[in-house]
Every structure is written in structure tokens, then in C-alpha cells.
């Protein structure tokens, strides 16, 4: 045998000690290159919207309805109906959404991939997706997994007698796990020590991004749990859960304490108390939980399972391992006498009985109705009946005083429950889809909802090229500076989040509460700029014929374009910034202030802005912002350098403006940052602001933040800066800046995409 044959082959590509092993805090630029075309197997010209429009949705729903009662021996349906399993699948696909950063949710079909496919809260959902495969296989790319998971939940409800509010397609699949979502920093499943141990804030030791305050440490926890402070932006109380522990906080079976966790986690998913009660009660009208035996009978999750299991996990050695022997959550609860039929049985049982604490066969805390007969059907043996049971979190709806009032109203008014659940379910499953312009299909509801951030439909002729040129001249002659115009346009457009497709310049909500008062937008300067632009708008619209108008939303973006063209001209470059009119102005009545408040940037490195102190360094928060703006590393780099040259910053400090000719679109930021004649030193132990002095004379040249200096410190970013700092780079710099700028301005223009 040759020496090569004897030698163990341990140098496969990607193996060995990695850069992240050596430097775990290294900046995560890879967050800006995920979901590229290299991971997508579909043809480059594939258009999912067109494919979905060709889909026979009624035929898909018919096939799904047939599947509901087509019980398979390898995974038998509880009560002969897969509906409850598919409701849980859809709920858990959508329920990872959190309003804080818009990440999570159903929009990209991420339940197929790690870590979600292996979360403890998603046990057995691998089987649900395998049950769906024949239907996905039949319709191919006309319906994404992301859409199919949600549609299946709707059909499940409808086949059990519930009238849903509607369904919209349009969720495009991704083909690899999300890298940007911070799920927490615990190292064990169901851990919660970090998200609560550090108060309201946490830091991701693995180099990911988290925006969280430094404050709120170690408060005393009261009986109602109000002293618990879940770190932002997390929406679950333990690693691997969707929301809360159904046994109660950390397994403590206290309904009142559990109510605090429910309220906090559902609020972070943008749900109010009524929506929360409706969702829990509506969901628990159907099906059951599974805890037939001890958890040590359950094998590894899908990502840790053996190859021969073919992506299925949690192999169960208890009894038959399925059907009546299923172990999922460890709880063994069936809520109603009709678990495959819509009704008000959940609330009827909740208030009819007094409840005693007991344990499931798996040893989990749950509740059984005191002095109750056996009225609940068995999921797999029609000859057996069971006593009514509830979860600790179910009892929260009765014993929390606010939830109790809502619950009693729903008990007495089943029609109100049905309407509230239908609307809350639609919101749950569509919250991360963005505006209605992205909705596809014949079942899109006609009603416009404020949480969709509605914008009026275009109702007037648009400005033409001649109008645009004239308006640019008026804007530049208005007395507003280049930096003021660019700052305002950036502030308007950069609220966009690629995560949940919210924000952006369309709607001109920058002139409305709460955006007009955000510190990052410099309210006094903003009011001045808006007043001037409103005057130009009024004058222009007042002399047009045929109903032609320009919206303030368009004029804000056009002002930024005019200013950039002027700044490029000052640098000796002629450039035309792309501009597509058609934005409309939203009203204050169309703006949910509390919901829009979640879009406020706590950090915007492009404007050198930090609202507070965060454990994540400023440069990591820049990556977070760039990722939400769907920018690549080169786009982020050229945008930041250009904005610094244009003197765009929040507040009075001019950190990072490394140029002696501000408001000129030059590559000075890069040239001066890379100048070895400058020596940098921190101004304080916090190391958040630095001064750059001439190495020979000691003369102060510049001041900069961590965000500025990372472009010279980080090897990859420095390599990008070197491109734009080169002698032959000015033209390329302007061209690339304009392209990246135009991309940001149009991120929310789904109607023209």
C-alpha cells in the first residue's frame, strides 16, 4: 500500500484552523455577500413573480386539501388530519420575525435550513415539509417553499372550517442559511442565560451583529416577571424557541409570570394584546402537543443526524416512534373536544374548569381540568377519551388581568374571535413581506391595513425630462447646500430594510411623526430643508396642466440627485444620477407611529451616528446597516467615502470628513485615510474617536471614528479603499458612487422592479 493510501486525508477544502478561530471578533464582511447567484440553482433570468402568476392556485389548494386527510403510515396524522401540524409549520415559519430589525419570518423559506430546521421548537416539522414534497415537486418553481409553507397553513385552517383573511404570494426562496440573523449567544439549546444574564443587551461573540443597549443589568425579577429584560432584538425567551416556554419562564409553571414573557415576545413580533390572545387561542383550537415519553428517547436533530436519515431528525425510539408515541415538545395537551374543527372550545374549556398542575408522561409541567370528565378525543384511538388539559401559557390568558378581559370578550363573542384571529394570522404570515405592491395572487385582500405602511396609489401624470431639469435648477438655486440635500435624501431612503422590505423614500414619511423628530435626522435642519422643498413643490404643481404633479417624496430624492451632480461637477466629472419619478406621499393617518418607530436607526455609520452606547462596536453596526440596505462590501465602501466627501453627517462633529474641499464628490476620503503621513491615536480609553496628526509636525489633520478608521485597518476594506484611492480612480469612484446611491434611492420601488 502506498504512503498516500495509508495517510489520513484531513485537508479537505475549508477544513483546518480558520481565520475566525484565530480572530473570533473579526468583522463579518461575509454578511454582505450572502445569497449571491453562486448559491442559486435557478436560471439567471428566472422571475418568480411571473412564475407565480402562471400558477393555478386553486389546483394547488385542492391538492393541499386532499393531503390534509391522506394519512401516511410513516407519519400518521393526529385525529386523521394533518391540519394542526401544518398550522404549526406555517406559524413557526413566520413566527421568527421580530420588528426590531425586521429579520426572521417566512419570507425566504429559511425553515428548511440550519439553525431553524433543527431548533427544539421545530421538532417534527421536518416531517411536515416531507409530507409537502410531492406537491412542491408537482408545481416546481411556480411556487416557492416560502410561499408553500404559508399557503399550506391557510388551507389547513380552511379545511377545518375557518375562513381566512387572505393570502399573498411573492416570497422568494433563498438557497443557504441566513448569516445575518442574531438568534442569541447561548451555547446550548433552550439556554437563556445570555439574553437575560446581560440585561437588555447582548453581544455576539461569534462576530455577528446585534444592536443592544448597555443598560438594564441585574434588575430584581418580580412575581409577574416584569424585571426580566430580554436583550434586543430577540423575540424568544430561550435559544431554539419561537416565543416562550409553554411550561412557563425557565420551566416555572406560573401563568402570571408567563404572561410577561408572552406580552414581550409577541410585542417584538409587532402584535398587540388582542392579536396575541387571538393567535394563541385560535392556534390552540386545533390539534395537540406531543409528549408520549421521556425526551431521552429522541435522537439528534436533522443537522446532527446520520446520513441515512436523509435530513430527518429526532428519531424516536419510544414505542413505534410515531402516532400515539410521538415526542415533540414533551407536553401532552389537547385543548378542545373538536381538535380538527374551528370553534370556541378553547375559551369554553379555559373558563369552564379550575386547573390543577400535573406532569406529562415526559415529565413536563402542564395543567389538567379538576373534576372534569373524559371528553377529549384521543389522537389515534377512537375508543379512548381524555380529560381537558392546558399549558401554563394558556392559563395566562385567564389570569393576566388584561388578557382575561379580552379572553372573556372572545368567549362571549365568537364572531369577534374569528375576525381577530383571521386578521392576526394574516399579519403573522405576511408581516415581513413589505408593502402591498409585493403581494401576488387572486386571494390578496382588498382592505388596506396600516401595518402594511400604505402609500396612496399613483393618481396623476408624472414629470418629464424637461420638468426634471427645471426642478433641479430650482433646487440648486434655493440656497440649500449639497450636504443638506444629500443628507435629507439619504435620511429618507436609508430607512429601508431588506429584511422585511419596510422603510424607504416612497411615502415621504420623513416629514411625518415619528421620523421627523428622530435625532439622526437633525430635526431643525430637516424642517428647514423640507420647507424649501415644499415651496418648490407647491410652485411647480400650481402651474401645471392636466393634473401633472411631483410628490415631495420624489422631490426629496431629486434634490439629492441634483446635489450629487453638482458635487461631481465640482470634482471635474459630468454625471447624470438616475431618477425614476412615481413616488407618492403618505399621510399621518396612514402611518402607524409605533410601528414606524422600529425603523429608527440606533446607528448609521454612513452618517457617523450612534444614538447610544452599544456593546457591539460601531464598525459592526455599520455592517448591520449595510446588510439591511442590501449593499455589497464595495457598495458600502464607495457610499461611505462619498458621503464623507459630501460632508454628510449627523450632528455637529465632522469626524471622517477627510477633505479640504467638502461637498465635492472626490475620492479624498480614501486618499487621506491611506496616507502614511498621518498617525492615528484614540482620544479616550473608549477608543471611539481618534485624531490623525502629521507624523513629522504633529499638526492635527483629521478626526475620525471607529467606522472611519476600520476602512484603513481591516485588510479587505483597505483593499477596497486602495482601488478608490488610486490616481486613476476618480471617474470610477464617481460612477460607482452614483450607482450605489441610485440603488439605495430605489430600494422600495417594488412597483417598478
UniProtKB/Swiss-Prot annotation:
Binds 1 heme b (iron(II)-protoporphyrin IX) group per dimer. Its EC number is 1.11.1.21. PROSITE patterns: PEROXIDASE_1, PEROXIDASE_2, PEROXIDASE_4. GO terms for molecular function: catalase activity; heme binding; metal ion binding. Heme b binds at residue 284. It is an enzyme of class 1 (oxidoreductase). GO terms for cellular component: cytosol. This is Catalase-peroxidase. It comes from Paraburkholderia xenovorans (strain LB400).
Amino acid at each position: 500500500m502506498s504512503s498516500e493510501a495509508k495517510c489520513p486525508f484531513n485537508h479537505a477544502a475549508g477544513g483546518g484552523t480558520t481565520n475566525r478561530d484565530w480572530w473570533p471578533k473579526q468583522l463579518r464582511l461575509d454578511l454582505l455577500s450572502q445569497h449571491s447567484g453562486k448559491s442559486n440553482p435557478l436560471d439567471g433570468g428566472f422571475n418568480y413573480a411571473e412564475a407565480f402568476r402562471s400558477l393555478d392556485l386553486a389546483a394547488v389548494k385542492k391538492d393541499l386539501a386532499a393531503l390534509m386527510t391522506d394519512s401516511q403510515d410513516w407519519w400518521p396524522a393526529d385525529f386523521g388530519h394533518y391540519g394542526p401540524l401544518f398550522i404549526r409549520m406555517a406559524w413557526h415559519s413566520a413566527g421568527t420575525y421580530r420588528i426590531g430589525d425586521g429579520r426572521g419570518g417566512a419570507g425566504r423559506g429559511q425553515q428548511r435550513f440550519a439553525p431553524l430546521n433543527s431548533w427544539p421548537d421545530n421538532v417534527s416539522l421536518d416531517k411536515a415539509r416531507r409530507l409537502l414534497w410531492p406537491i412542491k415537486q408537482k408545481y416546481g418553481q411556480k411556487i416557492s417553499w416560502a410561499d408553500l409553507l404559508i399557503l399550506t397553513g391557510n388551507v389547513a385552517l380552511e379545511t377545518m372550517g375557518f375562513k381566512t383573511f387572505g393570502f399573498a404570494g411573492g416570497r422568494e426562496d433563498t438557497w443557504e442559511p441566513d448569516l445575518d440573523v442574531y438568534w442569541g449567544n447561548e451555547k446550548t439549546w433552550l439556554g437563556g442565560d445570555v439574553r437575560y444574564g446581560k440585561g437588555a443587551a447582548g453581544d455576539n461573540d461569534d462576530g455577528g451583529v446585534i444592536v443592544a443597549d448597555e443598560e438594564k443589568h441585574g434588575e430584581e425579577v418580580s412575581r409577574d416577571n416584569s424585571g426580566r429584560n430580554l436583550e434586543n432584538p430577540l423575540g424568544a425567551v430561550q435559544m431554539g424557541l419561537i416565543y416562550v416556554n409553554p411550561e412557563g419562564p425557565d420551566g416555572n409553571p406560573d401563568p402570571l409570570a408567563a404572561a410577561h414573557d408572552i406580552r414581550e415576545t409577541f410585542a417584538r413580533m409587532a402584535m398587540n394584546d388582542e392579536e396575541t390572545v387571538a393567535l394563541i387561542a385560535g392556534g390552540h383550537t386545533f390539534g395537540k402537543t406531543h409528549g408520549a415519553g421521556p425526551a431521552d428517547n429522541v435522537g439528534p436533530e436533522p443537522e446532527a443526524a446520520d446520513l441515512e436519515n436523509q435530513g430527518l431528525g429526532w428519531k424516536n425510539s419510544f414505542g413505534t416512534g410515531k402516532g400515539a408515541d410521538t415526542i415533540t415538545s414533551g407536553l401532552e395537551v389537547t385543548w378542545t373536544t373538536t381538535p380538527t374543527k374551528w370553534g370556541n372550545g378553547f375559551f369554553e374549556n379555559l373558563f369552564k374548569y379550575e386547573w390543577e398542575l400535573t406532569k406529562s408522561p415526559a415529565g413536563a409541567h402542564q395543567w389538567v381540568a379538576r373534576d372534569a370528565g373524559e371528553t377529549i378525543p384521543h389522537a389515534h384511538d377512537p375508543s379512548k377519551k381524555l380529560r381537558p388539559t392546558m399549558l401554563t401559557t394558556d392559563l395566562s390568558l385567564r389570569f393576566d388581568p388584561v388578557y382575561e378581559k379580552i379572553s372573556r370578550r372572545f368567549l362571549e363573542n365568537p364572531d369577534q374571535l374569528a375576525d381577530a384571529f383571521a386578521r392576526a394570522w394574516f399579519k403573522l404570515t405576511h408581516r415581513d413581506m413589505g408593502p402591498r405592491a409585493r403581494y401576488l395572487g387572486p386571494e390578496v385582500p382588498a382592505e388596506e391595513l396600516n401595518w402594511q405602511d400604505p402609500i396612496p396609489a399613483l393618481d396623476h401624470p408624472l414629470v418629464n425630462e424637461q420638468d426634471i431639469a427645471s426642478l433641479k435648477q430650482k433646487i440648486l438655486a434655493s440656497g440649500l447646500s449639497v450636504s443638506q440635500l444629500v443628507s435629507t435624501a439619504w435620511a429618507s431612503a436609508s430607512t429601508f430594510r431588506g429584511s422585511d422590505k419596510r422603510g424607504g423614500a416612497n411615502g415621504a414619511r420623513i416629514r411625518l411623526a415619528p421620523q421627523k423628530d428622530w435625532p439622526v435626522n437633525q430635526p431643525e435642519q430637516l424642517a428647514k430643508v423640507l420647507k424649501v422643498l415644499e415651496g418648490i413643490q407647491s410652485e411647480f404643481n400650481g402651474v401645471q396642466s392636466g393634473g401633472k404633479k411631483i410628490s415631495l417624496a420624489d422631490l426629496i430624492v431629486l434634490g439629492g440627485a441634483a446635489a450629487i451632480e453638482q458635487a461631481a461637477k465640482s470634482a471635474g466629472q459630468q454625471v447624470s444620477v438616475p431618477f425614476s419619478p412615481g413616488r407618492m406621499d403618505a399621510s399621518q393617518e396612514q402611518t402607524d407611529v409605533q410601528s414606524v418607530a422600529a425603523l429608527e436607526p440606533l446607528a448609521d455609520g454612513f452618517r457617523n451616528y450612534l444614538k447610544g452606547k452599544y456593546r457591539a462596536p460601531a464598525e459592526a453596526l455599520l455592517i448591520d446597516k449595510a446588510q439591511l440596505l442590501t449593499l455589497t462590501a464595495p457598495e458600502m465602501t464607495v457610499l461611505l467615502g462619498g458621503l464623507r466627501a459630501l460632508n454628510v453627517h449627523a450632528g455637529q462633529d465632522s469626524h471622517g470628513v477627510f477633505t479640504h474641499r467638502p461637498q465635492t464628490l472626490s475620492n479624498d476620503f480614501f486618499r487621506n485615510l491611506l496616507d502614511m503621513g498621518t498617525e492615528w491615536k484614540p482620544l479616550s480609553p473608549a477608543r471611539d474617536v481618534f485624531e490623525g496628526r502629521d507624523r513629522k509636525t504633529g499638526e492635527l489633520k483629521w478626526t475620525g471614528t471607529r467606522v472611519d478608521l476600520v476602512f484603513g485597518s481591516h485588510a479587505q476594506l483597505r483593499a477596497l479603499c486602495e482601488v478608490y484611492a488610486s490616481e486613476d480612480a476618480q471617474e470610477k469612484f464617481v460612477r460607482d458612487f452614483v450607482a450605489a446611491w441610485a440603488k439605495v434611492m430605489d430600494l422600495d420601488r417594488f412597483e417598478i422592479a
